[in-house]
UniProtKB/Swiss-Prot annotation:
Residues 124-136 are annotated as: WPD loop important for active site topology. Its main location: nucleus. The lineage of its organism: Eukaryota, Viridiplantae, Streptophyta, Embryophyta, Tracheophyta. 1D-myo-inositol hexakisphosphate binds at residues 135-136, 140. It comes from Oryza sativa subsp. japonica (Rice). This is Inositol diphosphatase DSP1. It is found in: Nucleus; Cytoplasm. It comes from the Eukaryota. The active site is at 160 (phosphocysteine intermediate).
């Protein structure tokens, strides 16, 4: 009985205390509760930080291909001139050979890279002149094609400065050896040359005589 009386007294006093409290101001009910929002749990913050760190690390190891890089066939690639930032990507191709169509001396940094990875350099300098009536040296195109046709040089990367005209002519003549129709050859050339396609290049590929070179199957992988 004494315990029940004590509990009743406590409840009565608590009720009386709340009754005597002043009412809450109305502005408390209308206040903006955005400040009361709970901060995100630590686990979420940690996951966000880990994600940002992973993305940064991935960015540092990103492989950047050279301008106009593409696979021509099994073991044959084409591109513009690889610069220093492209060398990690070039390394991933595990090349045996590089075929350069520029007449200028090959950069020392690129030569060091080739030596370090046991990659052989073939260079057949072709003038990159934009003059419409400058003849394309057919003999150098033929020598370049012989390098590409020798599977002992594969994987091989063919490149000029931009990977458009000189590289496009070599690849176009290679396609003739693979028995591509001219429409498909021209379409591939224009895909890389775009608005800078040259009529002289198209004419050269059309008239190029493949009789002295061995013909290929549809693909080097055959």
């Amino acid at each position: 009985m004494r315990q029940e009386a004590t509990c009743s007294l406590v409840l009565t006093q608590d009720a009386q205390h709340r009754k005597n409290q002043p009412p809450l101001a109305e502005e408390d009910d209308d206040r903006d509760h955005t400040d009361d929002a709970m901060p995100p749990p630590c686990s979420i913050l940690l996951r966000q930080e880990e994600g940002e760190a992973t993305a940064a690390a991935a960015g540092e190891g990103l492989l950047v291909p050279p301008l106009n890089f593409a696979m021509v066939d099994h073991g044959v690639y084409r591109s513009g001139f690889p610069d220093i930032s492209n060398l990690p990507f070039v390394e991933s191709l595990r090349l045996r050979s590089v075929l350069c169509l520029c007449p200028e001396p090959y950069p020392e940094a690129n030569q060091e890279f080739l030596r370090a990875h046991g990659i052989r350099l073939f260079q057949f300098g072709i003038d990159g002149s934009k003059e419409p009536f400058v003849n394309i040296p057919e003999d150098r195109i033929r020598e370049a094609l012989k390098v590409v046709l020798d599977v002992a040089n594969h994987p091989v990367l063919i490149h000029c400065k931009r990977g458009k005209h000189r590289t496009g002519c070599v690849v176009g003549c290679l396609r003739k050896l693979q028995r591509w129709c001219l429409t498909s050859i021209f379409d591939e050339y224009q895909r890389f040359a775009a608005a800078k396609a040259r009529v002289s290049d198209l004419r050269f590929m059309e008239l190029f005589d493949i009789s002295s070179l061995k013909h290929l199957p549809a693909s080097f992988s055959c």
